[in-house]
Amino acid sequence: APEAPGSVFDSRLIVLGIKGKRVSLPATLKLTAALRGLLMRICPEQPPPEWFSGHRLDGTPTAVPHLALTPLPFVGSEHADGRIMGLALVLPTGLDQQEAGHCLEPILRDPATGLLREHPLFDGQWFECAIELETRERSPKNLDPDTWTWESRVWASVTPVVLNRHFDGKDKWERAAESVKDACLHIGLPRPREVLLHPVSLIEGVPHAREYPQLMRKNGGGRRSHNHAVIVFDEPVRGPVLVGAGRFRGYGLCRPMDEKGEDRG
């Protein structure tokens, strides 16, 4: 069978396991910010390349897809509690593997010994934990890249999808849904047939949308609206599906579902 359409994000996720005190999904933005700070600081190439940093050398935002960071939470089963079990480094599709390895390998493993490197992540009241490359032969389901990239027609959000603007008026939900369809096109996926927005996720263990801090607009432009989403395509697509304005920072992460509206895993 021909391969299902994918997005600008590579489905070969690099998974980092988290150790330490429980970190819950609403800490996503804080956690990805701490990870990004760490990566930028210890990248062997300084200043870090555009695909890694998301910025050109002059400091302006890049126009090309770049490294995204996303939480991998314990969700989608009966006892799921939404805690973050790991983080994924999501590379842009088409990035040269040697180039990626040159920047990431020394961060993940000690260049002298080849042993895994553990890095602390800390943010005051939010979390205190450590991350390390996940290398177990049989990873827990939520740390298995397949769980997040499996081909599926229906996807449901685990972290809220940030809308590109605030919608008013009686048709605001239709217009907001259309904007999420456009956001899927924007990452190289086909335009979905249907998008349903709701403050509650379809997936067990995922917190209500209002429990997640809102993404702030750049230059003090206020808070951005967000909501959970169910996205239905005409044909199966391959993940990861990261959509909306927060997609490089862990918002808009969706999970493949089967046709019955149950978790695919």
Name each region found by the language model.
Residues 1-265:
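RNA-interacting cores
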